[in-house]
């Protein structure tokens, strides 16, 4: 995976995120409006209704149309995960922040468990 190499993230970790998020289905959509393999929230559609302290939560994100392209979706998801890793300093915390707001550490732990089983 050229994008995981560029951001120095193990491709198996990205595969684990994709498996947890979408089961590998590039056409996956969540009830909350997340799109594609890495289930990225776009700036339009259902996600446009989410309001944060300073306005729409996902205003700076790509559109649904952008995220429907599997390669773009992976590239953007990796970039998001890398930013979170740089901010938190470890993958467990970065994955917790990447996942849905109401799931907490269990989301990160599920992905790390999937990741630990890759290559076995």
Residues of each region from the PLM?
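Catalytic glycan-binding domains that act on GlcNAc-containing polysaccharides
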Residues: 1-120
């Amino acid at each position: 995976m050229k994008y995981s190499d560029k951001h120095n993230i193990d491709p198996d970790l990205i595969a684990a995120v994709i498996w947890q998020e979408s089961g590998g289905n590039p056409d996956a959509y969540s009830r909350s409006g997340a799109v594609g393999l890495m289930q990225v929230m776009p700036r339009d559609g259902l996600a446009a209704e989410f309001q944060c302290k300073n306005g729409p939560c996902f205003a700076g994100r790509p559109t649904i149309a952008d995220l429907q392209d599997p390669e773009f979706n992976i590239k953007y998801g990796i970039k998001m995960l890398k930013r979170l890793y740089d901010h938190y300093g470890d993958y467990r915390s970065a994955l917790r922040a990447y996942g849905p707001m109401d799931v907490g550490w269990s989301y990160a732990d599920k992905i790390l468990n999937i990741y630990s089983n890759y290559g076995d």
